[in-house]
Structure formats: structure tokens, C-alpha cells
Amino acid sequence: MKHRNIVIVLLLVVAVPVAALAAAPAGRQRTAIGKLTIVADSWAGPLQGPWTWAGDVTITAGGSTLTAGTVKIWLEKGGQRIQRMEASGGVRLTGTYTMAPAGSPPADWKVDASAQEATYDGGTQTAVMTGKVALQATNTSTGEVVTARAGKATYNGKAQQFRFEQSGEPVQVQWQEPPAKAAGQ
């Protein structure tokens, strides 16, 4: 059961959809694409795309937030879905996500993941984080913590498979049990 939870948390973190935010500070560009809100120092590109946001980029959707130095987005024909996204310059993904694995009650996980770069391909539903990938996910009910460190993390949404890799070094994954409950709790 623990191993299934670890796998589900790792899948969730790498597969999390691009994320959510509040109002843009004065002087910053704010753009909405579908259910995404993007705030950055600048936004440029041809009308049909691709578009590039640069300078303290924050993308929000739902309860998730993605931050990076630069983000480039290509939209599918019709402009309603992301065909491809590239983020670079200190990429960070945060949010709280609910999981309900088969046979287990739903659980909320607070997630914080970072990497130097990240890409997403909408056609293959593949997300890749590269360069000092670090992940921490905490079960908000039990206090269980999963951490992972790797050089690269890949998630294929269609196949629902993930892979953490580290060139020449082992991938590091740690599971911390929840704190023991005192008698009578």
C-alpha cells in the first residue's frame, strides 16, 4: 500500500497540469488562455504564436502554480489547448492535489517540485522536468512525506507511467512515515 501511494504521488507531481494565481501587480502583463492565468514582466510573439513570457513568470490554474524565468507556449489550432510548453530559469510547481487510489480513501497532498527546465507536449501528454529535479509531497492528513531527487523526471499521461533518471548517479527517493499517534488518539 505504501509503495502504491509513493507511485501515485510521484505520478501526480510530474503530471500536474500547468497551474493557478491571483491579480497581476502593477506594470506586469496578465494573460488568460483557457483556464490558465499567466503573469510576467513581458509577453511577445506573433499573433498566431508561439508566445513567450519572460521575467518572473507565474502561471496558475485551479489550485496549482508554476513559476519560471521564461515560458514559451504553442497552442493547438483553434487556440483552446496547449500543444507544447517550455519553461526555463528555475522552474517551480506548487499546489495541493487530491488523490483517491483504488481501495483507499481520498487524500490531499501538498506538493512542491522544482527543476531547471520543464516541457509539456499536449499531443503525447508527456511532461519532462530536467536539471536538479527535486520533489516533496506531504499528505496533509497523515503527515507522510515523499521526497525525490533526480536529474530528469518524465511522466507519460496517456500510459500513466513515470520515470526518474540520474546520469551516472542513483535516483534518490525517501518515504517518511507519519508521526506516531499517542495512546488514546
Identify the meaning behind each predicted range.
Residues 1-185:
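Mature-chain termini and adjacent capping regions
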